[in-house]
Design a protein with these regions (language model features):
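Substrate-binding/active-site clefts of carbohydrate-active enzymes
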Residues: 3-14, 18-57, 64-174
Length: 174
Protein backbone atom coordinates (compact mmCIF):
# COMPACT_ATOMS: atom_id res chain seq x y z
CA UNK A 1 0.00 0.00 0.00
CA UNK A 2 1.72 3.14 -1.13
CA UNK A 3 1.65 6.17 1.13
CA UNK A 4 1.60 4.13 4.31
CA UNK A 5 4.73 3.64 6.36
CA UNK A 6 5.32 0.78 8.71
CA UNK A 7 4.65 1.49 12.36
CA UNK A 8 7.14 0.89 15.15
CA UNK A 9 5.13 -2.18 16.15
CA UNK A 10 5.47 -3.59 12.62
CA UNK A 11 9.26 -3.41 12.82
CA UNK A 12 10.00 -4.01 16.50
CA UNK A 13 10.47 -7.32 18.25
CA UNK A 14 10.03 -6.67 21.96
CA UNK A 15 11.81 -8.37 24.84
CA UNK A 16 9.76 -7.85 27.99
CA UNK A 17 11.46 -7.46 31.35
CA UNK A 18 9.77 -7.09 34.74
CA UNK A 19 12.52 -4.96 36.32
CA UNK A 20 11.68 -5.52 39.99
CA UNK A 21 11.91 -9.29 39.61
CA UNK A 22 14.66 -9.37 36.99
CA UNK A 23 16.99 -7.29 39.15
CA UNK A 24 16.21 -9.04 42.43
CA UNK A 25 14.70 -5.95 44.05
CA UNK A 26 13.16 -6.37 47.52
CA UNK A 27 9.40 -6.88 47.71
CA UNK A 28 8.84 -3.56 49.45
CA UNK A 29 10.78 -0.28 49.35
CA UNK A 30 13.25 0.26 52.17
CA UNK A 31 12.22 2.33 55.15
CA UNK A 32 15.62 3.97 54.92
CA UNK A 33 14.36 6.20 52.13
CA UNK A 34 16.21 7.57 49.15
CA UNK A 35 19.65 7.20 50.76
CA UNK A 36 19.40 3.43 50.33
CA UNK A 37 19.26 3.60 46.53
CA UNK A 38 20.76 0.69 44.67
CA UNK A 39 20.92 1.28 40.90
CA UNK A 40 19.44 -2.11 40.01
CA UNK A 41 18.40 -0.90 36.56
CA UNK A 42 22.12 -1.05 35.70
CA UNK A 43 21.83 -4.85 35.93
CA UNK A 44 19.74 -4.85 32.75
CA UNK A 45 22.42 -3.15 30.63
CA UNK A 46 24.69 -6.23 30.21
CA UNK A 47 21.64 -8.13 28.90
CA UNK A 48 21.03 -5.69 26.03
CA UNK A 49 23.51 -7.50 23.78
CA UNK A 50 21.61 -10.73 24.53
CA UNK A 51 18.41 -8.96 23.49
CA UNK A 52 20.02 -8.14 20.14
CA UNK A 53 21.46 -11.67 19.78
CA UNK A 54 17.91 -13.04 20.19
CA UNK A 55 16.82 -10.91 17.25
CA UNK A 56 14.90 -8.36 19.30
CA UNK A 57 15.27 -4.62 18.89
CA UNK A 58 12.91 -3.33 21.59
CA UNK A 59 12.92 -3.45 25.38
CA UNK A 60 9.47 -3.46 26.99
CA UNK A 61 10.01 -2.54 30.63
CA UNK A 62 7.44 -3.48 33.23
CA UNK A 63 6.61 -0.87 35.87
CA UNK A 64 9.52 1.35 36.91
CA UNK A 65 7.74 4.11 38.84
CA UNK A 66 7.55 4.37 42.63
CA UNK A 67 5.15 1.80 44.05
CA UNK A 68 4.25 0.04 47.28
CA UNK A 69 5.05 -3.54 46.28
CA UNK A 70 4.91 -5.16 42.84
CA UNK A 71 5.10 -2.07 40.64
CA UNK A 72 1.46 -2.14 39.56
CA UNK A 73 0.43 -0.14 42.66
CA UNK A 74 1.97 3.20 41.65
CA UNK A 75 2.37 5.94 44.23
CA UNK A 76 4.36 8.44 42.12
CA UNK A 77 4.43 8.59 38.31
CA UNK A 78 7.32 11.07 38.35
CA UNK A 79 9.85 9.11 40.40
CA UNK A 80 11.73 5.91 39.58
CA UNK A 81 11.07 3.21 42.19
CA UNK A 82 13.88 3.53 44.74
CA UNK A 83 14.35 -0.25 44.63
CA UNK A 84 15.50 0.16 41.01
CA UNK A 85 17.61 3.27 41.46
CA UNK A 86 16.93 6.85 40.47
CA UNK A 87 16.59 9.03 37.38
CA UNK A 88 20.32 8.70 36.68
CA UNK A 89 20.09 4.88 36.64
CA UNK A 90 17.07 5.06 34.34
CA UNK A 91 18.91 7.50 32.05
CA UNK A 92 21.93 5.16 31.86
CA UNK A 93 19.66 2.30 30.79
CA UNK A 94 17.93 4.44 28.16
CA UNK A 95 21.29 5.73 26.87
CA UNK A 96 22.62 2.15 26.63
CA UNK A 97 19.54 1.16 24.65
CA UNK A 98 19.82 4.14 22.31
CA UNK A 99 23.50 3.46 21.65
CA UNK A 100 22.52 -0.04 20.46
CA UNK A 101 19.51 1.09 18.44
CA UNK A 102 17.07 -0.53 20.89
CA UNK A 103 13.63 1.01 21.24
CA UNK A 104 12.17 1.29 24.75
CA UNK A 105 8.54 1.07 25.81
CA UNK A 106 7.37 1.53 29.39
CA UNK A 107 4.43 -0.26 30.96
CA UNK A 108 2.31 2.69 32.05
CA UNK A 109 -0.03 1.53 34.80
CA UNK A 110 -2.87 4.02 34.39
CA UNK A 111 -5.89 1.88 35.24
CA UNK A 112 -5.33 1.92 39.00
CA UNK A 113 -2.92 3.17 41.65
CA UNK A 114 -1.67 2.06 45.06
CA UNK A 115 -3.52 2.92 48.26
CA UNK A 116 -0.69 5.30 49.25
CA UNK A 117 -1.13 7.37 46.07
CA UNK A 118 -1.43 10.91 47.54
CA UNK A 119 -4.60 11.86 45.63
CA UNK A 120 -6.30 8.63 46.76
CA UNK A 121 -5.43 9.29 50.40
CA UNK A 122 -6.83 12.82 50.02
CA UNK A 123 -10.00 11.48 48.37
CA UNK A 124 -10.61 8.94 51.14
CA UNK A 125 -10.20 11.67 53.76
CA UNK A 126 -12.59 13.99 51.88
CA UNK A 127 -9.82 16.48 51.07
CA UNK A 128 -10.26 16.65 47.30
CA UNK A 129 -9.56 14.51 44.25
CA UNK A 130 -12.75 12.44 44.79
CA UNK A 131 -13.57 12.68 41.08
CA UNK A 132 -10.38 10.75 40.25
CA UNK A 133 -11.80 7.59 41.82
CA UNK A 134 -15.08 5.71 42.04
CA UNK A 135 -15.74 6.53 45.70
CA UNK A 136 -19.03 6.12 47.54
CA UNK A 137 -19.77 7.34 51.05
CA UNK A 138 -22.55 5.86 53.16
CA UNK A 139 -24.71 7.63 55.73
CA UNK A 140 -22.68 6.18 58.60
CA UNK A 141 -19.49 7.82 57.37
CA UNK A 142 -18.05 4.70 55.75
CA UNK A 143 -16.17 4.92 52.48
CA UNK A 144 -15.95 2.40 49.67
CA UNK A 145 -14.19 2.52 46.32
CA UNK A 146 -13.93 0.49 43.13
CA UNK A 147 -11.02 -1.92 43.21
CA UNK A 148 -9.10 -3.36 40.26
CA UNK A 149 -10.16 -7.02 39.98
CA UNK A 150 -11.39 -6.82 43.58
CA UNK A 151 -7.94 -6.09 45.05
CA UNK A 152 -8.35 -3.53 47.87
CA UNK A 153 -4.76 -2.34 47.44
CA UNK A 154 -5.49 -1.26 43.82
CA UNK A 155 -8.04 1.60 43.70
CA UNK A 156 -9.32 2.12 40.16
CA UNK A 157 -8.93 5.47 38.50
CA UNK A 158 -12.04 7.13 37.05
CA UNK A 159 -11.12 7.75 33.41
CA UNK A 160 -14.11 10.07 32.98
CA UNK A 161 -12.40 12.53 35.34
CA UNK A 162 -10.51 15.48 33.85
CA UNK A 163 -7.98 15.13 36.68
CA UNK A 164 -7.26 11.57 35.59
CA UNK A 165 -6.98 12.61 31.94
CA UNK A 166 -4.38 15.21 32.98
CA UNK A 167 -2.59 12.70 35.23
CA UNK A 168 -2.31 10.12 32.45
CA UNK A 169 -1.33 12.68 29.81
CA UNK A 170 1.27 14.32 32.05
CA UNK A 171 2.62 10.93 33.12
CA UNK A 172 3.01 9.77 29.53
CA UNK A 173 4.75 12.98 28.49
CA UNK A 174 7.08 13.10 31.51
Amino acid sequence: MSGYGMSVNDTTIWWQVYPLGFTGAPIRPSNEGERALTPRLDAIIPWLDYLIDMGANGLLLGPVFASETHGYDTVDYYRIDSRLGDDAAFDRLIDACRSRGIRVMLDGVFNHVGRSFPAFRDALAGHGHESMFHITRNAGGGVDYRRFEGHPELPELNHDSEEVVRLVTDGMLH
